[in-house]
Amino acid sequence: MGRFLNPGNKAFQKTLKSEIYVDKTMLLAYTNKVIGSDMACICNSRPRRFGKSITANMLAAYYSRGCDSFDMFSTLKVGRLDSFETNLNKYDVIHIDVQWCMMDAGEVQNTVKYINNGILDELIIAYGDVIPDTVKTAYGAMSYINAATGNTFVIIIDEWDVLIRDEANNKELQEEYINFLRGMFKGTEPTKYIALAYLTGILPIKKLKTQSALNNFEEFTMLDAGALASYIGFTDDEVKQLCKKYDRDYEAVKNWYDGYMLSGKHVYNPKAVVSVMMRGSFQSYWSQTGTYESLIPLIDMDFDGLRAAIISMISGNEIKVRTTTFQNDMVSFKNKDDVLTLLIHLGYLAFNQKNQMAYIPNEELRNELMDAVEENKWDEIMQFERQSIDLFNATINKDVNTVAAKIEQIHMEYTSVIQYNDENSLSSVLA
């Protein structure tokens, strides 16, 4: 076993020993269906604490020939399938955690070289007799290995987008990284040596102009989770079972932590659900995820309508969002829709795929956004609060003219033109 090549199953073994483990191994039924096909390159993006690393470790444990995982998986859901053993521990797996590599590389500028050389060194140890001394890249080595042995690889990249997010202004490093990924996955040779590729991170694959930098990948995102919706977070049935086991109020859990609708399925934040099961306290666990510090600069961006849109969603409205212009990075914002699209990928907003509307999914996230805007002392939110107080006082005093005028004012200011005549937007104003 190596650090990159066939790392084994110990990481996933620790997950299985957790107090709460929700079985998501049926994802393997999907990957087993597409492995070795032209749909075998997958990018599954989701917010922090939605189980990305656990999934990556599960895939490595299942496919890696560097370990024996039969006993580990035979008692799980995937173990019931007739095809369970077909691909079990049959492949050379390359598993890369870019976040860890970035830290261990010493200088962030060395990250890509560190990853390439680390993989290449381990491939030479395992297959040195078929790799010429002139080969300088990991993907070049895999090409030679495949040509000589016929072996194919499962490549798993966890936190694939960390260099895109954390080094947003380092164009030289980003270009080097994108070129490395293209060498690994794009072209005729990669189709020969790749059995399966699985990238996971917060952001979808970076766009170059209007096209994905890796347009041969099937993307599953918070905008469109497709067939992987059930594996992105906890489902309604899974949460009901946990509430029963830990004697928690299901309706309260639903109010606090539900709200994402992915391909028609209710999806909950796993981190929050596990925390409330273990602690019994209904509170916001989101600020513990590490993305809160990135929220305030985003919502403070000077785009027309951004603050009004956020205040409108805090009050319960949905907002129309055009998601197609977002470049899948942290710097190329052209309008409020790009910012709102990023907030969807970060998990602060949910997205209704049918009507292309964004909304705040639950009480936990509403509190987070309220804290953020109040911390920044937005004039708009203070004005909104004053209007709400005036409306309340007018209602108590039975001043029907003022009540009508205030409702009309708030409805005009915090409801989009598209939604103005929608009864849900008016009910949100009244709420």
Give residue ranges: language-model regions:
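Phosphate-binding site recognition
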Residues: 1-428
